[in-house]
Amino acid sequence: MLDINFIRQNPEKVSRMLEQRQQREDIAKLNQLLDFDVRRRTMVQRTDELKALRNKVSKDIAVIKRSGQGSADDLIVQMKAVADEISGMDDTLKSLEAQIEELLLSLPNKLHEDVPEGRCADDNHIYREKLSFDHKLDFPLDNHLDLGKRLGILDFERGAKITGAGFPVYTAKGARLERALINFMLDQHTSVNGYTEVLPPLFVNRESLRGTGQWPKFADQVYYMNEDNLYAIPTAEVPLTNMHRDEILDASDIPLAYAAYTPCFRREAGSYGKDTRGFLRVHQFNKVELVRYATPTTSYDALQEILSHAEGILQALKIPYRVLLLCSGDISANATKCYDIEVWAPGEGKFLEASSCSNFEDYQARRANIRYRPEDGGKPTYVHTLNGSGLATSRLMVALLENYQTPEGSIRIPDVLQPYTGFSSIDQAAE
């Protein structure tokens, strides 16, 4: 969340940020927050004055009682009235602070100066692209749905029977190819890029969702187990970031870099009218996630590193892609700056998002209370957190199948994956 001191000192800047994000309705929340903040500070000052008066009156009563001269009854009555007022103000303050925190949690992050202004995804900027891999696709192309069904490697109908729409089944060489993708990406990120592998829980508590910003703003997107008060993770970003919640790290611990493979679960509420065929929008998918902890002076270098690591996977797989710098109206509420990587799916005839790489600066760290001690021994300060998909396999699988299809209807396996799959092509319905 944003620092209340920053909001107090820069209300116009925060209001402008909300306009840039196309969240003008939140300006009312900002104004309410500023009003509550003034009331809170006034009440704190008044409470401090009353407590000072209570201490003085208490000492005066003690002096009168020790001297045995005069009556302290009037002072005792006065002190009781002061104590009652303090108690009432403390209760009001507690309620006011809870409302302030709720408003702070609901406001989005500030925007980096490089973020282009725009209203929606159409205004995102192409940052760079790499489309010139040698895939000879000069024949009628199938999409991943038709390829998967014909080759017997993907079964969406049985997934729908078992669970419901949006829960795919991988079979035979499709399952092995999915596992190969996951293992290849983990090996790249750990052995080559230097990330520490983590195998985290798949369910988290509400405090963890609040720490990364999924709660309360995106509460309708997560699956909830009512009896256990736990949530299925929408991304490994949640457990990886909350590993250090309520901790003070040493400067020598920074930077931290974690990589994790997990299934991810998303309700995709509000997806009505969007293309939900096959892997284009699913409720369960696999992803290798990258999370970094950095200092304020190094976090934007770390963002470029995460982006290059995600791109490196696509370059090794020789899958055409482009990188978008998201505009102010499309960037997530939690991020200060974000790049999306979109893979080219020739069978679909369009680009598909396969990764988002974001810097949150101290927005998540404030929510999760993650700090570090500077090397000079100064006061602990908040870390900067970053994350990137490295990558999500569902849309990556779409691009792989569609780019590596042959005129004969087979699928060639990328060279870097063949040691993991144990086969070089998929050309028959089942094993």
Curated annotation (Swiss-Prot):
Keywords: Aminoacyl-tRNA synthetase, ATP-binding, Cytoplasm, Ligase, Nucleotide-binding, Protein biosynthesis. It is an enzyme of class 6 (ligase). Its main location: cytoplasm. InterPro entries: aa-tRNA-synt_IIb (IPR002314), aa-tRNA-synth_II (IPR006195), aa-tRNA-synth_II/BPL/LPL (IPR045864), Ser-tRNA-ligase_type_1 (IPR002317), Ser-tRNA-synth_1_N (IPR015866), SerRS_1_N_sf (IPR042103), SerRS_core (IPR033729), tRNA-bd_arm (IPR010978). Pathway: Aminoacyl-tRNA biosynthesis; selenocysteinyl-tRNA(Sec) biosynthesis; L-seryl-tRNA(Sec) from L-serine and tRNA(Sec): step 1/1. Its EC number is 6.1.1.11. It holds the Pfam family tRNA-synt_2b. Belongs to the class-II aminoacyl-tRNA synthetase family. Type-1 seryl-tRNA synthetase subfamily. HAMAP family: Ser_tRNA_synth_type1 (MF_00176). This is Serine--tRNA ligase. It comes from Prosthecochloris aestuarii (strain DSM 271 / SK 413). The lineage of its organism: Bacteria, Pseudomonadati, Chlorobiota, Chlorobiia, Chlorobiales.
